[in-house]
C-alpha cells in the first residue's frame, strides 16, 4: 500500500465533489446516471487498490494514464465479465470525470506532456 500524498488527497477531494455535487448540479438530474458515475469511480478505485496497491489517498496523475485505463477495461471485461457496452459506459463515465479533473487541475489534463516539459 502506498502512502497518502498531497496529490492523492487533492484527487480524492475532487472525486468526492464530482460524485456528490458536480454531477447532480451540472450534468444530470437522473438518479441512474448519477449512480453510474459514482459506481464507475468506485470500480476504478477498487481496481487500483486490488490490482495495483494504490489507495484513494495515494492517487496520482499516473493512475489515469492510458495504459492503466486500458488495463482497467480489460479487468472489467475479464475479471468482472462486463460486456462491451458496459465497458464503454464505464469508460465514458471515467472520461467525463477526467475532463472535469483537467478543468480543475491543469497538471492532470495531460500527465505525459507535463512530465516531458518538467524534465
Question: How would you describe each model-predicted region?
Answer:
Residues 2-4, 17-32, 38, 42-119:
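N-terminal core-binding DNA-recognition domain of tyrosine recombinases/integrases
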Residues 2-12:
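Acidic, low-complexity proline/glycine-rich segments
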